[in-house]
Amino acid sequence: QAVHQREFGISKGLFWSPAGSALAFYRMDESMVTDYPIVNIDARCAKAEPVKYPMAGMKSHEVTVGVYNLSTGETVWLETGTPKEKFLTNIAWSPDEKSIYIAELNREQDEMNLVRYSALTGKKEAVLFTETNKHYVEPQYPVLFLPNDSGKFIWQSQKDGYNHLYLYDTTGKQLKQLTQGEWVVTQVIGFDAKGENLFITSTQPHIRSSFNYGTPMNVNGWKLNLKKGETSLLTPNAALESVHNLSVSASGKYAIDSYDAPKIPRIINLIRTKDGKEIKNLLTAKDPYKGYVLPEI
């Protein structure tokens, strides 16, 4: 089950290893958490039903992570230690299935440690790095290993004030900041077949846009070269301020580009990732407001 109120990127409770030989999972103990009444209005006669909710300053639930081995039928519990109320977030497996990476956040939510555990013994292997902020630290995404180099991974972080991508090795050394600027990476989509480029969407401004700053009203698809740290625009209609969503083919050669805006009905195109060229229009939705006089702000 999902834990920690589904915060910090947590949306599930089961995590298969890359080859499917083991299953990591959350276990949550709420016995120490006070009940909080919630009115159930689904029934004809509404009634109060208690839920477990940790109020500020009171006991929170305790979470542990287990690893079930399919071949032996045995479960190993990761030795995450104390304090037991810390948040265990963004679980990820190493490509060789020997280690598990967890972003551990303290109850105050101002310090995060990226920790590596042995999936075989449950022992803590290393604290790779720590992120702190006097206001708030919010890990949202697990480590993403490079497909052609299992000794390196990409980490998403807001440590400079904007959500950007960083390249680390498995010792915890930051090799480079892959993206930077006063804009945010909104989605990491995947790698090309050779693992040389990463496809993302972001609010990065560009020369075709009337914006010279990052804005959530203008999200485009980009190809990020991991070696050079350079981005190239993928979405051919980027001059139109709109929000793009990409779905990249397994080969990484093509992508489905879907976008719309308050004044642009849904448009879906097949594009070539080599140069962002539009190959074919798949859908151009009709304008539902055509013929109406719309109010202006």
Report residues per predicted region.
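Beta-strand C-termini and the immediately following turn/loop, strongest in propeller blades
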Residues: 12-15, 24-30, 55-59, 95, ...
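Signature of short aromatic-glycine-proline-rich micro-motifs recurring in repeat-based ectodomains
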Residues: 2-18, 90-92, 139-151
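Short loop/turn segments that connect beta-strands within beta-propeller blades
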Residues: 69-73, 119-121, 169-173, 225-229, ...
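Polyanionic (Asp/Glu-rich) segments that form extended negatively charged tracts
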Residues: 126, 164-180
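Extended catalytic-interface subdomain
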Residues: 8-37, 49-73
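Residue-level detector of Asp-centered blade-edge/turn motifs that repeat once per structural unit
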Residues: 18-19, 95-96, 147-149, 192-195, ...
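Carboxylate/His-rich catalytic cores and anion/metal-binding grooves
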Residues: 39-53, 58-62, 107-123
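Non-catalytic accessory segments flanking enzyme active sites
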Residues: 22-28, 33-37, 62-64, 78, ...
